[in-house]
Each structure stands twice: as structure tokens, then as C-alpha cells.
Amino acid sequence: MKKTLILLAMVIALVILPFFIDHGGEFGGSDGEAESQIQVVAPHYEPWFQPLYEPASGEIESLLFTLQGSLGAAVIFYILGYSKGRQRRDDRA
């Protein structure tokens, strides 16, 4: 029980603490940051690849990103649960 409370407090701290560390911070994407750095380093750079699908709006892009993350988490936790179930089954035998 004590271990659970400590872990819960750590998770809450990890979620809340960033809001107090940098009040004027801006939540920006890594793609935009990389693009601006490329323009600084090599202003005449031409991208050599175009995306296969470009979402119509930022909301759709966020939705697809969230779905991708959810699917990845589902696969990871399925594998973890499956291996835990196999381990329990093998322990009983």
C-alpha cells in the first residue's frame, strides 16, 4: 500500500511540476523546431521527401497522432499481459 502511494505521488508530481518550473513555456512540436533549425543551418535546403498523406487540419493530425499512440500502447500492454499470463500458467503446471 505504501509503495502504491509513493508511486502515485511521483506520477502526480511528474504531471504537475512542469507547469511550475517554466511559467512562460510554450508547448511546441519537434517538427516545427527542427524545421526552424534547418533554416538557420542550411537556408537553401529543399526537402527530398513529401508525406504520403497530409491531414486537412491540425485537429485531424492530432487525432491520428493520438490513435497511433493508443494503438502502440495497446500492443505493448497486450504483449505484457500475454507474457504475464503465460508465466502464471507455467508456474501452476
Swiss-Prot record:
Membrane topology, as annotated: Multi-pass membrane protein
Gene Ontology annotations for the cellular component aspect, listed alphabetically: plasma membrane
Subcellular localization: Cell inner membrane
Keyword Protein transport in annotation: no
Entry keywords, A to Z: Cell inner membrane, Cell membrane, Cobalamin biosynthesis, Cobalt, Cobalt transport, Ion transport, Membrane, Transmembrane, Transmembrane helix, Transport
Membrane-crossing residue ranges in chain numbering: 5-25, 62-82
Keyword Membrane: yes
Intrachain S-S bonds: none
Pathway: Cofactor biosynthesis; adenosylcobalamin biosynthesis
One Gene Ontology biological process: cobalamin biosynthetic process
GO molecular function: cobalt ion transmembrane transporter activity
HAMAP family: CbiN
PANTHER family named in the record: COBALT TRANSPORT PROTEIN CBIN (PTHR38662:SF1)
Assembly with partners or alone: Forms an energy-coupling factor (ECF) transporter complex composed of an ATP-binding protein (A component, CbiO), a transmembrane protein (T component, CbiQ) and 2 possible substrate-capture proteins (S components, CbiM and CbiN) of unknown stoichimetry.
Purpose of the protein: Part of the energy-coupling factor (ECF) transporter complex CbiMNOQ involved in cobalt import.
Family under the similarity heading: Belongs to the CbiN family.
Protein name as annotated: Cobalt transport protein CbiN
Source organism: Citrobacter koseri (strain ATCC BAA-895 / CDC 4225-83 / SGSC4696)
Upper taxonomic lineage: Bacteria, Pseudomonadati, Pseudomonadota, Gammaproteobacteria, Enterobacterales
